[in-house]
Design a protein with these regions (language model features):
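Cysteine-centered motifs
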Residues: 9-10, 37-39, 53-56
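N-terminal Rossmann-like FAD-binding beta1-loop-alpha1 element of flavoenzymes
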Residues: 62-92
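N-terminal FAD cofactor-binding segment of flavoenzymes
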Residues: 79, 88-133
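Short beta-strand to alpha-helix junction loop
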Residues: 139-159, 201, 271-279
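Predominantly flavin-linked oxidoreductase catalytic cores and closely associated redox partners
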Residues: 168-295
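FAD/FMN-dependent oxidoreductases across multiple families
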Residues: 174, 245-247, 271-349
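Long, low-complexity C-terminal extensions of enzymes
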Residues: 344, 348-446
Length: 446
């Protein structure tokens, strides 16, 4: 794999370019390639110093271009690297950030091995659900709940790609992607690149239509805490603790214990607007001091985040040669925000088709429309009467086997199981939301 670190811009060309070369950062473990400056080749001075530019224009042809090197872009790159039938494909990965910080974590459940099991920070075999009047700790049978730290993931995939000469990484931002007759043109901060196919995982740009669609957030603040006494069960995820006040919204505590004296404790909401940070912190403090009855603890880390939850259509592609990935392709599940496993399934689906046929699959995401309807109904309920969300999840966990609930949330249930799930919850909130969906406009709080 090759790495280039590029910026802008040359006086003697109208094409994208970069400043005179003074210093470049080489990431250990990667080959570094310095392309020849075209100003030098033409005999042009190129800049006031008389020196050639580091790069005045780069145009490289690739089979696949990945716009973005976060979870979605790196996942697709990794799946390509593991497919022997795609070894002859040249792949360009464009990412503006160094990705050398632990900027997030991903949690997910799975009933089998994953390509990233070696970097799983912790896994759990029990899952707890709590609400007023119902509490249960479920023993997981075929599933395991897992967590991966972002920095571990970035390092793992980049190390794998560094050993593979078919990959090139350029630290640059993608400004525009354009379909052309031969494939795709990518205009970037490093110049122009072309490829046969592009995979775009940049954040989506939504033209919001609140009169037609529902726009909520899963927003949270989390504290990683250490205690002086054993208080957490390292085998049990506190998946949802709804025992706190709901305040006409869906509000719960989520806990990932790493040991008896260390855990990540998050206060999470499903609603339209974030809170002042002090309100999240007050809720976490109340949980630690009143629910867990802790008198002393240390906050050693913090997580803050907001994940869009919407039924706004997120197209799987932008023309014949540009495929969307990650949140841009709707891989964050609208009603829960979980994305990591959906990203892996999407990557595997695309790579399998490319390896087998040389072409993209006809159904780019392989999504099933009934689950989109279920998500839309739940989002409508959250928007109209957010506090009812607690009752719906309570009925789901109280009246169904845990494996069925997790399979349903993972969109892997059959039609008979979908019927059993829907039959287990009070119908009236859903019937009212069905009416709103049929009328084509979101419901409002009555």
């Amino acid at each position: 794999m090759t790495i280039s670190t590029l910026s802008t811009c040359c006086r003697q060309t109208s094409r994208p370019a970069v400043v005179p070369y003074t210093k470049s950062r080489v990431i250990p473990g990667f080959f570094y390639v310095q392309p020849v400056c075209r100003c030098v080749l033409r005999g042009s001075r190129g800049n006031k110093s008389g020196a050639g530019c580091f790069i005045c224009f780069v145009k490289s042809d690739y089979d696949y271009l990945l716009a973005g090197g976060g979870a979605a872009g790196l996942s697709l790159a990794y799946h390509i690297s593991q497919e022997p039938r795609l070894r002859d494909k040249r792949v360009l990965l464009l990412e503006p950030a160094a990705k050398d910080q632990n900027d997030r974590t991903w949690s997910f459940w799975t009933d089998g091995p994953t390509p990233f099991d070696s970097i799983v920070a912790h896994d759990w075999q029990q899952l707890a659900f709590r609400s007023p009047g119902f509490e249960r700790v479920f023993q997981l049978q075929r599933y395991r709940y897992k967590m991966i730290r972002g920095l571990d993931f970035y390092r793992f995939v980049r190390t794998e790609l560094a050993q593979n000469p078919q990959f090139t990484l350029v630290q640059a931002s993608v400004e525009t992607l354009r379909n052309v007759a031969t494939g795709v043109e990518a205009h970037t901060s490093a110049g122009l690149y072309t490829a046969r196919l592009a995979f775009d995982s940049r954040p989506p740009e939504l033209d919001r239509q609140p009169e037609k669609y529902r726009y909520l957030l899963q927003h949270f603040v989390g504290w990683e805490v250490e205690t002086e006494q054993d208080v957490f069960d390292p085998a049990t995820v506190e998946f949802m603790d709804f025992r706190g006040e709901q305040q006409q919204e869906a509000r719960f505590i989520y806990v990932l214990p790493f040991g008896p004296r260390q855990a990540l404790v998050e206060y999470t909401l499903f609603s339209e607007m974030p809170l002042p940070k002090a309100e999240y912190e007050a809720a976490i403090r109340h949980y630690l001091e009143h629910t867990l009855q802790l008198t002393t603890y240390r906050v050693v880390g913090e997580e803050v985040g907001a994940i869009p939850m919407t039924d706004h259509p997120l197209p799987a592609s932008a023309g014949p040669h540009i495929v969307h990935l990650g949140t841009r392709a709707g891989r964050a599940k609208p009603s829960t925000g979980y994305a990591f496993q959906r990203i892996q399934q999407h990557s595997a689906h695309l790579v399998q088709a490319l390896a087998s046929t040389g072409h993209l699959p006809k159904n780019l995401t392989n999504d099933q429309p009934q689950f989109h309807l279920f998500d839309t109904l739940l989002l409508d309920i959250m928007r109209r009467r957010g506090e009812v969300t607690r009752d719906i999840f309570t009925e789901l966990f109280q009246r169904n086997p845990i494996e069925r609930v997790l399979a349903f949330l993972d969109e892997r249930t059959s039609w008979p199981d979908n019927f059993r799930i829907m039959n287990s919850v009070t119908p009236w909130p859903f019937l009212r939301s069905i009416a709103h969906v049929l009328r084509g406009r979101p419901g409002k709080r009555s």
